[in-house]
Amino acid sequence: MRPAGRSVQQVRPVTITRHFTRHAEGSVLIAFGDTRVLCTASVEEGVPRFLKGQGQGWITAEYGMLPRATHTRNPREAAKGKQGGRTLEIQRLIARSLRAAVDLTKLGEYTITLDCDVIQADGGTRTASITGACVALADALSSMQKKGQLKTNPMKGFVAAISVGIVAGEAVCDLEYVEDSAAETDMNVVMMEDGRMIEVQGTAEGEPFSQQELNTLLELARGGIDSLVQAQKAALVGA
């Protein structure tokens, strides 16, 4: 039996709290069960040098964990003087995923930075970051419209992400830490709301997985992402 008695396809309770901080154009606290991530979207005029003069915008991301987001304290990466490989991988994933949600040619020469800070980690921090950052991004784009910085909203659709895996021989959706640490196969899936895939990261930690198991995992991911998109849209009602 899974922790908390969840079924194989059941995601953890998800809450999305908008306008969590005052200053950012978009700000969301998202919870996937006991995993909590603060996601902010900040708008700045200008784009990276390689895009100057092209009339299009850019979306980038930064990711980090508070020192005591985990069971034992991890020193801040700033104190070490450099970011770790995992951090760099995750923030690039977040940025790639959210760029897929926006028509950058309609953004104008603005850069939106998505900052995802893990307050508490219990598995799925990158998937929670992407899902929460999408809502923060939606709020930032709405803010830009209200300020007259955008004529139309360039958002093409919602993006969400979920983890799936094989634990004790069974395919399950939305792994928490105890499941993730024991998984034979671990996979993160990022999708548009219409089911088109943005990224699939899958690794066999133990036994290799079959094509049939891969299909089962992707079906579980689609169901989980559908429920996350519903939560995103519900959070934005009345935006």
From Swiss-Prot:
GO molecular function (one): tRNA nucleotidyltransferase activity
Entry EC number(s): 2.7.7.56
Biological process (GO), any one: rRNA catabolic process
Superkingdom, taxonomy of origin: Bacteria
Keyword Transcription regulation attributed: no
Keywords for the protein's UniProt record, in alphabetical order: Nucleotidyltransferase, RNA-binding, rRNA processing, Transferase, tRNA processing, tRNA-binding
Binding site for phosphate: 86, 124-126
Pfam families, per database record: RNase_PH, RNase_PH_C
SUPFAM superfamilies noted in UniProt: Ribonuclease PH domain 2-like, Ribosomal protein S5 domain 2-like
PROSITE patterns registered for this protein in UniProt: RIBONUCLEASE_PH
Catalytic reaction list: tRNA(n+1) + phosphate = tRNA(n) + a ribonucleoside 5'-diphosphate
Disulfide-bond pairs as recorded: none
UniProt entry tagged with the keyword Zinc: no
HAMAP family to which the protein is assigned, alphabetical: RNase_PH
The family this protein is said to belong to: Belongs to the RNase PH family.
Quaternary assembly: Homohexameric ring arranged as a trimer of dimers.
Function: Phosphorolytic 3'-5' exoribonuclease that plays an important role in tRNA 3'-end maturation. Removes nucleotide residues following the 3'-CCA terminus of tRNAs; can also add nucleotides to the ends of RNA molecules by using nucleoside diphosphates as substrates, but this may not be physiologically important. Probably plays a role in initiation of 16S rRNA degradation (leading to ribosome degradation) during starvation.
Protein name (database record): Ribonuclease PH
